[in-house]
């Protein structure tokens, strides 16, 4: 079969159609549903309401609260992941003793399922019977409300997210560091540039494209967080740690309000798109400068 042989279409189009059906149909169906009033329990006939679901959602204080909570968790956790990940990647790239062991240990958290990590964290941070509070009580400190007080619960979720996903950042940044040309550093050493000057003027600017990509990927993933929150706090206390995806789960799988949930999903998509566009727009001048 040659490159221009028409028979190739018999192999390409079926696969392409399957992909389109699997990906496009649910998207179109969900968009259509977002303009309908549709409930499964109690079962009610679908009724066109236009932008009614979107208006109701945007006027719901709970939506803005969970959007703010999701943003807080995403930005704080990703920021910490990047700072810690860059520090560890720089250390590993410097060929420290026991580098292979360190790489293995640092990558372990990423290999564990988020639900399993959240279950372990919930047991460890249990405010009454958790090992951490038991140890603190043994040392004479009072029990801390790790999962029962808003600020502590948010902090606990962020710490767990940082612990699990910093290895991904380390892996990506370390790969980027190992592609940087050695001759640039040799020239800087001849100019008696300090380690800080080399990092500021060489390493960080040259690593910027990788950094932008890594932070962008982690931001998108952090906005989709549900498993860690669902298992550790269930969105509580109250709704203080509820995220956008958990809110959608509550509306879709507990209240069976499909139209409202579909509208929420598309607003979530818009939020992610806007954040991504703003993020890339802010960093584009720096990327062009250091290209």
Question: Where do the model's predicted regions map?
Answer:
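A structural signal for multi-pass alpha-helical bundles of membrane permease subunits
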Residues: 4-291
